[in-house]
Amino acid sequence: MAMPTIRHVRAFIVRGGGADYHDQPGGHWIDDHISTPMARYPEYRQSRQSFGINVLGTLVVEIEASDGTVGFAVTTGGEIGAFIVEKHLARFLEGQLVTDIEKMWDQMYFSTLYYGRKGVVLNTISGVDLALWDLLAKVRKEPVYQLLGGPVRDELVFYATGARPDLAKEMGFIGGKLPLQHGPAEGDAGLRQNLDKLAEMRSRVGDDFWLMYDCWMSLDVPYATRLAQAAHEYGLKWIEECLPPDDYWGYAELRRNVPRGMMVSTGEHEATRWGFRMLLEMQCCDLIQPDVGWCGGITELIKISALADAHNVMVVPHGSSVYSYHFVVTRHNSPFAEFLMMAPKADEVVPMFTPLLLDEPVPVNGRMKVPDAPGFGVRLNPECALVRPYAR
């Protein structure tokens, strides 16, 4: 069978949830008083939206093949990403065989090197790459995980990220990751409140349930060290993304400082094999958390995972729903997955990209069999208003 070529590439934007999961209405736990790099300024401390965390919005990339098959994916990128796709990246895709994903990734990355490398450009490349994998799998009438070598386990097991680990335990998750609420600018009183919250949750969940703290790039080495050492009393399993992503030296120091048995994790805001090579070779962490929608897509995550495996470091992708599920189920060094609790009070399981995607699977009792529908197995919700700002 002759493989089809790529006929059209289209980029859309949408507001209100979706891949930009911070784009939520008021009262959501994800926009509460959470420690951030901007929390050093009191006026930006109470809400993450106050400093613009949700300004980008969701980017939807749609790729149509010459046989009419359509692949798509969503990521964070919004109108900036749509511009990059339509004005720059589309030229490297249209007319190419749907199988030539490695070549297309290479051309997208190196053509944007002078203004890209990380951030919104890599988010955009990631979205295109995921759409290419969705397209190829649909052409072959297979789930993406079969293109990646097939599953190595029957089902995924999950920990939950959200404000209520105690409720996550009742729902069957293996652990709960809390957002850290107070950073260095709030002093010893804030540190005490962080520890009190951890102690409260430990008393609720017992000793056999993982508890972790997500620090979202907001700490420095001295504060993170104090937090880790004091939190050890409450059995903190790992401390996540304490420092700015580029502070590899700080991460290496922190990993030496934390109590024995506690893990340091990071990588949510890192990109490409070269960024993760720094983390791995400098022994910055015990597990890495690439986001497949930001780090370079499936094509790059394959390389990142192989690097980590050679360093005996686990790969636990950040969020990203079906895009990470199809990868995690195929890799031994990804023994569990993250589920982001998108219910406003973190009190029920709802799809991560709701309301944008239809057929998006969710864990039941903390477990999931990855669906075997072609591609990533999801559809765009026709009730979500997509806008194509740079139609060609």
UniProtKB/Swiss-Prot annotation:
Pfam families: MR_MLE_C (PF13378), MR_MLE_N (PF02746). The keyword Repeat does not apply. Binds 1 Mg(2+) ion per subunit. Substrate binds at residues 22, 48, 338. InterPro entries: Enolase-like_C_sf, Enolase-like_N, Enolase_C-like, L-Rhamnon_dehydrat, Mandel_Rmase/mucon_lact_enz_CS, Mandelate_racemase_C, Mandelate_racemase_N_dom, RHMD-like. Mg(2+) binds at residues 214, 240, 268. Its cofactor is Mg(2+). The active site is at residue 318. The record marks 291 as: Increases basicity of active site His. It catalyses: L-rhamnonate = 2-dehydro-3-deoxy-L-rhamnonate + H2O. Reaction proceeds via a syn dehydration. Homooctamer; tetramer of dimers. Catalyzes the dehydration of L-rhamnonate to 2-keto-3-deoxy-L-rhamnonate (KDR). This is L-rhamnonate dehydratase. It comes from Paraburkholderia xenovorans (strain LB400).
